[in-house]
A protein has these predicted regions:
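Conserved catalytic/coupling modules of large nucleotide/cofactor-utilizing molecular machines
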Residues: 1-137
Length: 137
Protein backbone atom coordinates (compact mmCIF):
# COMPACT_ATOMS: atom_id res chain seq x y z
CA UNK A 1 0.00 0.00 0.00
CA UNK A 2 1.60 3.24 -1.15
CA UNK A 3 0.72 6.56 0.44
CA UNK A 4 1.75 9.78 -1.25
CA UNK A 5 2.22 12.96 0.76
CA UNK A 6 1.82 16.54 -0.37
CA UNK A 7 4.51 17.80 2.04
CA UNK A 8 7.00 15.39 0.50
CA UNK A 9 6.12 16.60 -2.99
CA UNK A 10 6.52 20.21 -1.83
CA UNK A 11 10.07 19.28 -0.79
CA UNK A 12 10.60 18.12 -4.40
CA UNK A 13 11.02 14.49 -3.39
CA UNK A 14 9.55 12.39 -6.20
CA UNK A 15 7.88 10.04 -6.10
CA UNK A 16 6.36 11.54 -2.96
CA UNK A 17 5.97 8.24 -1.12
CA UNK A 18 5.42 8.55 2.62
CA UNK A 19 7.46 5.70 4.07
CA UNK A 20 5.92 6.26 7.50
CA UNK A 21 2.52 5.04 6.36
CA UNK A 22 3.30 2.97 3.25
CA UNK A 23 3.61 -0.79 3.64
CA UNK A 24 4.74 -3.69 1.51
CA UNK A 25 2.70 -6.86 1.59
CA UNK A 26 5.64 -8.70 0.05
CA UNK A 27 7.80 -7.79 3.04
CA UNK A 28 5.06 -8.34 5.61
CA UNK A 29 4.16 -11.79 4.25
CA UNK A 30 7.75 -12.94 3.95
CA UNK A 31 7.68 -13.13 0.15
CA UNK A 32 11.09 -11.43 -0.10
CA UNK A 33 14.50 -12.64 0.99
CA UNK A 34 15.46 -12.14 4.63
CA UNK A 35 18.18 -9.63 3.70
CA UNK A 36 15.59 -7.53 1.86
CA UNK A 37 13.27 -7.52 4.87
CA UNK A 38 16.07 -6.65 7.30
CA UNK A 39 17.42 -3.79 5.17
CA UNK A 40 13.91 -2.40 4.60
CA UNK A 41 13.22 -2.40 8.36
CA UNK A 42 16.57 -0.73 9.09
CA UNK A 43 15.90 1.94 6.46
CA UNK A 44 12.45 2.66 7.89
CA UNK A 45 13.85 2.84 11.44
CA UNK A 46 16.70 5.19 10.48
CA UNK A 47 14.42 7.47 8.47
CA UNK A 48 11.87 7.60 11.28
CA UNK A 49 14.47 8.36 13.95
CA UNK A 50 16.55 10.81 11.98
CA UNK A 51 14.07 12.72 9.84
CA UNK A 52 10.56 12.39 11.19
CA UNK A 53 11.07 12.56 14.93
CA UNK A 54 13.66 15.31 14.97
CA UNK A 55 13.31 17.84 17.74
CA UNK A 56 16.57 19.60 18.40
CA UNK A 57 19.54 19.28 16.06
CA UNK A 58 21.64 16.22 16.91
CA UNK A 59 24.50 16.94 19.29
CA UNK A 60 26.53 13.76 19.10
CA UNK A 61 28.67 12.95 16.07
CA UNK A 62 26.96 9.55 15.80
CA UNK A 63 23.56 11.25 15.64
CA UNK A 64 24.77 13.68 12.97
CA UNK A 65 26.08 10.74 10.93
CA UNK A 66 22.72 8.96 11.27
CA UNK A 67 20.86 12.08 10.09
CA UNK A 68 23.22 12.45 7.13
CA UNK A 69 22.75 8.79 6.20
CA UNK A 70 18.98 9.21 6.48
CA UNK A 71 19.14 12.20 4.12
CA UNK A 72 21.22 10.15 1.69
CA UNK A 73 18.60 7.40 1.80
CA UNK A 74 15.80 9.89 1.28
CA UNK A 75 17.63 11.39 -1.69
CA UNK A 76 18.50 7.96 -3.05
CA UNK A 77 14.81 7.12 -3.14
CA UNK A 78 14.35 10.03 -5.56
CA UNK A 79 15.87 7.89 -8.28
CA UNK A 80 14.84 9.26 -11.66
CA UNK A 81 11.87 6.97 -12.19
CA UNK A 82 10.23 6.94 -15.60
CA UNK A 83 6.86 7.85 -14.02
CA UNK A 84 8.41 10.96 -12.45
CA UNK A 85 9.78 12.39 -15.72
CA UNK A 86 6.94 14.94 -16.08
CA UNK A 87 7.75 16.34 -12.62
CA UNK A 88 11.54 16.11 -12.56
CA UNK A 89 12.27 16.83 -16.23
CA UNK A 90 14.96 14.15 -16.00
CA UNK A 91 15.02 10.98 -18.08
CA UNK A 92 14.07 7.87 -16.16
CA UNK A 93 16.65 5.24 -15.34
CA UNK A 94 16.39 1.66 -14.20
CA UNK A 95 18.17 0.45 -11.05
CA UNK A 96 18.03 -3.27 -10.39
CA UNK A 97 16.44 -4.30 -7.11
CA UNK A 98 19.58 -6.03 -5.85
CA UNK A 99 21.67 -2.93 -6.56
CA UNK A 100 19.15 -0.71 -4.76
CA UNK A 101 19.08 -3.09 -1.80
CA UNK A 102 22.87 -3.25 -1.54
CA UNK A 103 23.20 0.52 -1.92
CA UNK A 104 20.72 1.06 0.93
CA UNK A 105 22.62 -1.40 3.10
CA UNK A 106 25.92 0.30 2.25
CA UNK A 107 24.50 3.74 3.08
CA UNK A 108 23.29 2.42 6.44
CA UNK A 109 26.72 0.91 7.14
CA UNK A 110 28.53 4.15 6.29
CA UNK A 111 30.31 2.99 3.15
CA UNK A 112 29.30 6.21 1.39
CA UNK A 113 29.90 8.63 4.25
CA UNK A 114 32.48 10.41 2.07
CA UNK A 115 29.90 11.17 -0.65
CA UNK A 116 27.86 14.37 -0.20
CA UNK A 117 24.11 14.08 0.36
CA UNK A 118 23.27 16.07 -2.77
CA UNK A 119 25.04 13.51 -5.00
CA UNK A 120 22.23 11.04 -4.18
CA UNK A 121 19.42 13.39 -5.33
CA UNK A 122 17.72 12.09 -8.49
CA UNK A 123 20.63 9.82 -9.31
CA UNK A 124 20.30 6.36 -10.77
CA UNK A 125 22.72 3.73 -9.57
CA UNK A 126 25.72 4.05 -7.30
CA UNK A 127 28.11 4.62 -10.22
CA UNK A 128 26.20 7.76 -11.21
CA UNK A 129 26.32 8.89 -7.58
CA UNK A 130 30.08 8.33 -7.42
CA UNK A 131 30.57 10.21 -10.69
CA UNK A 132 28.57 13.16 -9.37
CA UNK A 133 30.59 13.19 -6.16
CA UNK A 134 33.87 13.09 -8.10
CA UNK A 135 32.73 15.96 -10.32
CA UNK A 136 31.96 18.12 -7.28
CA UNK A 137 35.30 17.51 -5.57
Amino acid sequence: MIHLAREIAKAKIYPAVDLRTSRSRLIETGAVAEEHRVVAEQVRRVLAAALWNVGDPPEAAADRRMVERARKLQNYFTQPFFVAEPYTHRPGTYVRRDEALHTCRDILEGRYDDIPVKAFYFAGGIEEIRNRAAAVQ
